[in-house]
Amino acid sequence: MRLTKYLLPFTLILMFSLLTGCTSNEKGETASKKQTDEKMITIGWPLDVGPLNPHTYLPNQMTAQAMVYESLVDYNDDGTITPKLAESWDISKDKTSYVFHLRKDVKYSDGTAFNADNVIRNFDAVLANRELHSWMGMVNHIKEVVKVDDYTIRLQLDEPYYPVLNELAFVRPFRFLGDNGFPEGDATQDAMKAPIGTGPWVLTDYKKDEYALFSRNDNYWGEKPLVEQIKVKIIPDSESISLAFENEELDLIYGRGIISLDNYTYLKDSGKYKTATSEPLSTKALLFNTQSGPLAELKVRQAIQYAINKEQMVDSITHGTEKVADTLFWDAIPYANIDLAPILYNPKKAQQLLEEAGWKLQKGEKIRSKNGQPLTLDLIYIATDAIQKPMAELMQGELAKIGVQLNLEGADVMVGLQKLMDNQVDINFWRTNGPPTDPHSFANESATPNANGVYEAKLGLPTAKEIDTKIHQLLVGTDEKERVQLYTDILTMFHDQALFFPISYETNSVIYQPYMKDFAPRASEYDIPYAQMEKEK
């Protein structure tokens, strides 16, 4: 990889060294490299950052979108909502009208204005594709977004929807593209001209599937980042990311599943590097497809959960960086601190349940059968996730002990999701969204077709329609006590029907070079705290 912007400074230094009689070009090169590296943080990432379209999803990487684009409000790790591009807001008594007062000191990275007209243009572009964004419940309730004055807008709902501010804080789709980034006709769902945002970083160099270089936004209205550039090196293989880090080609490795936990533990235990772990941010689980096949039976779903030694699996594979999950959400998630009895490891109970369900182990056979059909299940895991594959392989072995054949397939996340929604696979690895949208985004998606697979997976449950009704009631209701009870009912029904197999509460783990200053990883799926990163002088 050759970058002209780095060759020019080097050439000038070399010429100066020759003119002043310097006898060691090697020393000059070393000094130049050190100066450049001090101003840049390099991180490894398994996937290309994508086109950086703020209004669309994959292949856009959320971590990169969050560097360039900002929201009206911000969600903090303690669960509070604070101002961002909106300096304040007013909510009507009936909870259907939100008036946002925009900051007047904000410019886009190209120097153009951020104002009410631009905000409405972005809202209109997103709302032109309501179906695409239907997983976000607010989209289905926005009646109109109108300009009050140059720096004030009003968002009008058709009925109350309590998570409005949380959803506005999410990384997509309600973040803001500069006017010069819009395509002709404003159809941003198809393409955009350029990734122009108000955030602290601007994309300045990019080579697909190799790297993306972000430079500090000189027009940024907030506190400037401590370093000048962030380089994201695209390295699909987790082993190669670890090796690049050991060779000091990377300054840090950040996030869940980027490298194997074995490699993380090896690097941590070497004593050469710094490490940190965030608070829990999401839950890793299996999602069972109840539409047809063996998993349409409750006892089969329960048997699978009893058959897997979850505690041993989580400890051995995550090396303590994740906590065993017995419920779908950890207790600190709003409305999720519910007393639910966990399903504990009990292979004898698992076999008993399968016998009761009519799945018998015939003499000389290793796989149970019923009415001539073998008890065979298909599981899809994300091929690029360094943790899901070893977990899938361990579960494959555990289920074989009770007479269940588990077939494994590694695939792209969207391939697995589509197969589940099309009723072509039995089990998917699945995870909650985490802050700032849990648990309400989970609830909304669970009642929305073609969202995250839960709606389709639960179609075989006897309580499916009742769950959908309760979800609608809690999202539009204004009574807090009623909302608490509805969440309790919904989460209890999912738990009792064994639709999910909670595995672990995930965290962001970070390992960084000793010359990096300490920083705290955030309990966020997408917000990497680049602005706080700095190298020792």
Mark where each language-model region is.
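Aromatic- and charge-enriched surface segment that lines or borders ligand/interaction sites
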Residues: 87-132, 154, 294-296
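Surface-exposed binding/hinge segments that line
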Residues: 137-181
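Long beta-strand-rich cores associated with HINT superfamily self-processing modules
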Residues: 510-537
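Gly/Pro-rich hinge or "lid" segments in bacterial periplasmic/extracellular proteins
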Residues: 77, 170-225, 229, 239, ...
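Extracellular/periplasmic solute-recognition and catalytic clefts
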Residues: 146, 204-215, 231-292, 302-303, ...
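Append "and occasionally in soluble cytosolic enzymes with long acidic Gly/Pro-rich linkers
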Residues: 296-397, 535-536
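N-terminal lobe/hinge region of extracytoplasmic solute-binding protein
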Residues: 44-93, 124, 196, 524-526
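Extracytoplasmic/peripheral linker and loop segments enriched in polar/acidic and small residues
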Residues: 405-416, 444-513, 537
